[in-house]
Amino acid sequence: MFSGLTLNCVLLLLQLLLARSLENAYVFEVGKNAYLPCSYTLSTPGALVPMCWGKGFCPWSQCTNELLRTDERNVTYQKSSRYQLKGDLNKGDVSLIIKNVTLDDHGTYCCRIQFPGLMNDKKLELKLDIKAAKVTPAQTAHGDSTTASPRTLTTERNGSETQTLVTLHNNNGTKISTWADEIKDSGETIRTAIHIGVGVSAGLTLALIIGVLILKWYSCKKKKLSSLSLITLANLPPGGLANAGAVRIRSEENIYTIEENVYEVENSNEYYCYVNSQQPS
């Protein structure tokens, strides 16, 4: 008996943990109407059951982010006219139609059939994927048809942004360039400009630093020479300046005396020669 009770507890726990059914993925193009099937079997004819549709995983009760709700026979809540039930409610068909889908409609949807009793609800989770619309073939001037295959390109610039990239091919297999090449070229140009700007800024900064260091070194050297001159003058004896001036004056007088002596010697020689010339032969 104890083992049977344990087995029942384990089964109940598994039911609680694995109550969600496997997700079924449905893919639709942008602008189309999406169809998400959901139905249940009536226990007896006319025994309809309330249900709800929500966006997100099925919670423990009701529907998260409720989109549509019914009682036994009628729709009692509808978030938008885009969400409609097109099946036969009297036969248990509660499939959801989403009109004119966009990329924001992708995600998981919950269909909850609220059968009477505890833990008796039927929960069905369906995954909706939205892809970009295909571009129709265009006829060229020479009669060659051109096909386009769209791809989704995600870029991050002040947030997440999704764009459609179209690559064109003609019958000859020639690829027609699209704006993807322009984006690539512009990106390389921007990176090159950034690198050049960083290099120029670094060079100017280095030159400025070197100039400041040179000016600082020159200023320090000039101050050092001025300090040495002041120290030399301060170490001279009290009469040193006067003695230096006197020595300079005496040197100038000696120069004048030497010049006068030379002049007198030249005059005496001339006189001697003149006297000798007066003697008889």
Swiss-Prot record:
Outcome following mutation: residue 53 to A: Greatly decreases phosphatidylserine binding
Location of region: Interaction with BAG6: 252-270
Alphabetized GO MF terms: metal ion binding; transmembrane signaling receptor activity
Any single GO CC term annotated in Swiss-Prot or TrEMBL for this entry: immunological synapse
Domain Ig-like V-type: 20-125
Disulfide linkage: 38-111, 52-63, 58-110
Cytoplasmic topological intervals: 215-281
Phenotype upon changing residue 62 to A: No effect on phagocytic activity
Binding residue positions for a 1,2-diacyl-sn-glycero-3-phospho-L-serine: 61-62, 112, 119
One GO BP: positive regulation of type II interferon production
Annotated positions binding Ca(2+): 115, 117, 120
Modified residues (Phosphotyrosine): 256
Post-translational modifications reported in the UniProt record: Phosphorylated on tyrosine residues; modestly increased after TCR/CD28 stimulation. Can be phosphorylated in the cytoplasmic domain by FYN. Phosphorylation at Tyr-256 is increased by stimulation with ligand LGALS9.
TM spans (from-to): 194-214
Region (Disordered): 139-160
Additional comment: Belongs to the T-cell and airway phenotype regulator (Tapr) locus, a single chromosomal region that confers reduced T-helper type 2 responsiveness and protects against airway hyperactivity (AHR), the hallmark of human asthma.
Family: Belongs to the immunoglobulin superfamily. TIM family.
Function as written in the Swiss-Prot or TrEMBL entry: Cell surface receptor implicated in modulating innate and adaptive immune responses. Generally accepted to have an inhibiting function. Reports on stimulating functions suggest that the activity may be influenced by the cellular context and/or the respective ligand. Regulates macrophage activation. Inhibits T-helper type 1 lymphocyte (Th1)-mediated auto- and alloimmune responses and promotes immunological tolerance. In CD8+ cells attenuates TCR-induced signaling, specifically by blocking NF-kappaB and NFAT promoter activities resulting in the loss of IL-2 secretion.
Record remark: domains: The Ig-like V-type (immunoglobulin-like) domain mediates binding to PtSer involving a Ca(2+) ion.
Protein's name according to its UniProt entry: Hepatitis A virus cellular receptor 2 homolog
Organism field: Mus musculus
Phylogenetic lineage: Eukaryota, Metazoa, Chordata, Craniata, Vertebrata
